[in-house]
From Swiss-Prot:
GO terms for cellular component: DNA-directed RNA polymerase complex. It comes from Acanthamoeba polyphaga mimivirus. Residues 1-137, 290-396 are annotated as: Disordered. It is an enzyme of class 2 (transferase). This is DNA-directed RNA polymerase subunit 6. DNA-dependent RNA polymerase catalyzes the transcription of DNA into RNA using the four ribonucleoside triphosphates as substrates. It comes from the Viruses. Residues 290-312 have a biased composition (Polar residues). One of its GO terms (molecular function) is DNA-directed RNA polymerase activity. InterPro entries: Pol_omega/Rpo6/RPB6, RPB6/omega-like_sf. Residues 21-53, 76-88, 97-137, 385-396 have a biased composition (Acidic residues).
């Protein structure tokens, strides 16, 4: 409501200023006419027609202070007539008033009017209602619900994750995939060297020649390393394998002699002067034939070695099985002979030992019994002799 009251005061001050400015403008206009009266030349040029004077609002018989009824509001701008109020009664203007009109029956507006009517000294004595008591009377659960309703809700909590494909961190999946080589009979790319592959092969091979590598073709000694690499490549004698990577971490391996060349290189850095290409091609053909022969001989030797190894392994297996069977038979016969000899020896040794031990024990026990009987008889005799001697002593 303070804004509404402020708008009222601003309206009144604005109207007063406008009236003051109006009167000041009129006075300045009159003073300007008095200070700068029109000259005779201006009047002659104007023609002195009554129509122009009446249209311009000038030249009347009445003095400046006593204007007629028709020209009483002649100097007022029509746009300012709505703001200029001669009666002093202010009316509501929807353009100037941005807010809603005041409601005299609203109790809150009446209270604000009363507070504004009070003096500056009575402002401190005005009792302001504390809303803390009203807040304490509220149910805390309702307050929490109101706060939660205003906050942003997470809609992912209520979704069923079993039927939703959530975006996971799959940045390391491609790195975990292992490279897979495509077999030679399933290669898909064209057997032609690309321009990039040619340049890469020439640069790498020239660098190897700079480091002291020996060329694989004759007749190029003393040339520039780039020319040596070019001649070796045209002869398809470069011992490189071109690896072509494909999507899905797959790759193909191509030998240089398997790839053709459709791109021509005419730079002087690579192409030697007055070089016999026919000899190189012939040498290349002979080298290829030799390689094929060597490969066939190698395969034959490998096959023969494999067959020999299989034969040797078969004989070894047979000999091992024979030795195992002989060993088992020997062990069986040995066990049988051992069992027989043990039984015989046990029976013989048992009878002998029993007879010997029996005779020895009997003889020993017999001799011992004889000795004991002799000792007993001797002791009896001694006792008899002692008795006789005693009696003899007494008899004496």
């Amino acid at each position: 409501m303070s804004s509404k009251k402020g708008s009222k005061t601003s309206k009144t001050s604005r109207s007063v200023k406008q009236t003051e400015e109006y009167y000041d403008d009129d006075a300045e206009f009159q003073n300007s006419e008095d200070e700068y009266p029109p000259s005779d030349e201006d009047l002659d040029n104007s023609g002195g027609s009554d129509d122009e004077n009446t249209q311009s609002g000038g030249l009347s018989d009445a003095p400046d202070d006593e204007l007629g009824e028709d020209s009483a509001t002649l100097d007022i701008d029509p746009d300012d007539e709505a703001e200029y109020d001669t009666d002093g009664d202010e009316k509501f203007n929807p353009i100037d008033e941005m807010g809603e009109p005041e409601d005299p029956d609203d109790p809150s507006e009446q209270e604000e009017d009363e507070v504004e009517d009070l003096g500056s000294e009575d402002v401190d004595n005005v009792e302001i209602e504390d809303d803390a008591a009203d807040i304490e009377d509220l149910d805390p659960e309702l307050v929490d619900e109101a706060r939660n309703s205003k906050s942003k809700q997470c809609y992912m909590k209520n979704l069923n994750k079993d039927f939703i494909a959530l975006d996971e961190d799959d940045s390391g999946i491609y790195s975990k995939i292992e490279y897979k080589k495509i077999p030679d009979n399933e290669r898909e790319t064209d057997p032609i060297l690309t321009y990039y592959e040619i340049v890469r092969i020439l640069g790498t091979r020239a660098q190897q020649f700079n480091y002291g590598a020996k060329p694989l073709i004759k007749g190029v000694e003393g040339m520039h390393p780039a020319k040596m690499a070019f001649v070796e490549l045209t002869a398809k004698m470069t011992s490189f394998i071109v690896r072509r990577h494909l999507p899905g971490k797959k790759y193909e391996d191509w030998r240089i002699d398997e790839l053709g060349m459709i791109h021509t290189i005419t730079e002087e850095l690579f192409v030697p002067d007055n070089f016999n290409w026919d000899s190189i091609t012939a040498l290349h053909k002979t080298m290829i034939s030799n390689q094929q022969k060597n490969s066939t001989t190698d395969t034959e030797t490998l096959s023969t070695q494999e067959n020999a190894s299989t034969r040797v392994s078969g004989s070894n297996l047979r000999s091992r099985s024979g030795s195992k069977s002989s060993k088992s038979n020997n062990s069986r016969s040995a066990s049988k002979s051992n069992s027989r000899t043990e039984s015989k020896s046990n029976s013989r040794t048992g009878s002998k030992s029993n007879s010997r031990t029996g005779s020895k024990s009997n003889s020993r026990t017999g001799s011992k019994s004889k000795k004991s009987s002799n000792t007993k008889s001797k002791s009896k005799r001694n006792s008899d002799n002692s008795d006789d001697s005693d009696y003899s002593d007494y008899s004496e």
